[in-house]
Every structure is written in C-alpha cells, then in structure tokens.
C-alpha cells in the first residue's frame, strides 16, 4: 500500500517545477491542478488503509466468536441460541467508536496527512540533490522506518531554521511516531487486537 502510494506521489512531484534554491520546501499545494491529483492519490490511500484495518477488525471479531462457538459446542450438546450470538451490533459500535475524540476515519486521515508531509520532505531533499524518482522512492522506504534520517537531511540541505520549522509542524505528539508507516502499523495492530478482546469479552458477559 505504502509503496504504491509513494511511487504515485513521487512521480507526480517530479513533474512540478520545484526550485530548491529558493529555500522553500516542496509542497503539493503549490500547483493547483497537480494538487488535485495528489489529493486523489491520498484519498485512495486513506480508503485502502481504512478498508484494510476494518477488514482486520471484522476478521478478528469473527475469529474470536468462532473460538467461543467451538468451546460452547464442546461443553453443551444443545447450547442456547443466545450463547451463539456473534453480536454484530456491538461490532458496528466498535468500528464507530472514538479514541481520544477521533473515530477510525479521522485517525486514518491524520496518518495520511503525515504521509503526505513525509513525501513532500523526501521530494525536497531528493530534487535538491538531483536524485531520480527511483532513487527518491528507495529513500522514502528508508525514511518511513527511520524518520530521523529524513530530518537530518532536511537540516543538511536547508539549514537549522528550516529544520526547526519542519520539526514544529511535524511534531506528532506524545506516544505517536514520526513515521506515518509506523503509526499505521501500530493503529492496525491495536484495533485488531482490541476487536478480538472486545468480542471475546462480550461473549462471556
């Protein structure tokens, strides 16, 4: 998912008339027509990420219920219907719930915006160094796992003042990674594991 979206955005960014010598960082919003293409690509990324996480939640919910169904059948020859309910209403409520005031869609949107900024910074560095789209794509894969490398290169290419502004805008908050990819992976794991525990807990109430 990240590789495909990265390649699309990098190819799009390479078509901009970005001038690193102005001291400004690359921004998709600097070109209105191409900005719409970037927005469409990011929207597709958000939808796919949401679908992956939602599918994982649903799969784990049913896995927990199937496990409990098996146990009930082993213990009782004719279990009551109420013991075999998969509580689909509770699943829908779980998917709609908010965490720290944000629902799943809003949290995915935040990850996508962080990813967009990550690509913009990578393009700023890559274009300033004359790197090809393929080179920048490889760089992005490294930065997604080691975001501090990206910040060091921003500092080296654009100076400490620009780095300071970037760091302020990019500060994700306590308990949040600087990497969109790492945040997406953690959110997926947390949501899917929570779905299993919630489904299991409801069955035993």
In which residue ranges do the predicted regions lie?
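N-terminal leader/targeting and assembly helices and adjacent pre-domain segments
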Residues: 1-174
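Acidic, glycine-rich two-metal-ion catalytic cores of nucleic acid-processing enzymes
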Residues: 164, 168-205
């Amino acid at each position: 998912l990240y590789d495909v979206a990265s390649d699309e955005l990098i190819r799009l960014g390479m078509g901009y008339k970005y001038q690193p010598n102005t001291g400004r960082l690359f921004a998709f919003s600097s070109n209105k027509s191409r900005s719409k293409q970037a927005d469409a690509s990011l929207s597709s990324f958000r939808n796919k990420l949401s679908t992956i996480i939602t599918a994982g939640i649903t799969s784990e919910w049913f896995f927990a219920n199937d496990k409990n169904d098996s146990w009930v059948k082993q213990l009782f020859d004719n279990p009551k219907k109420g013991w075999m309910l998969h509580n689909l209403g509770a699943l829908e409520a779980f998917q709609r719930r908010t965490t720290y005031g944000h629902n799943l869609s809003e949290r995915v949107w935040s990850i996508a915006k962080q990813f967009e900024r990550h690509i913009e910074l990578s393009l700023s560095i890559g274009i300033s160094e004359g790197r090809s789209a393929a080179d920048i794509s490889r760089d992005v894969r490294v930065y997604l796992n080691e975001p501090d490398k990206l910040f060091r290169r921003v500092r080296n290419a654009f100076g400490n003042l620009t780095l300071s502004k970037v760091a302020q805008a990019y500060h994700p908050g306590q308990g949040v990674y600087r990497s969109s990819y790492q945040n997406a992976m953690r959110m997926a794991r947390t949501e899917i594991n929570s779905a299993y525990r919630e489904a299991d807990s409801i069955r035993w109430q």
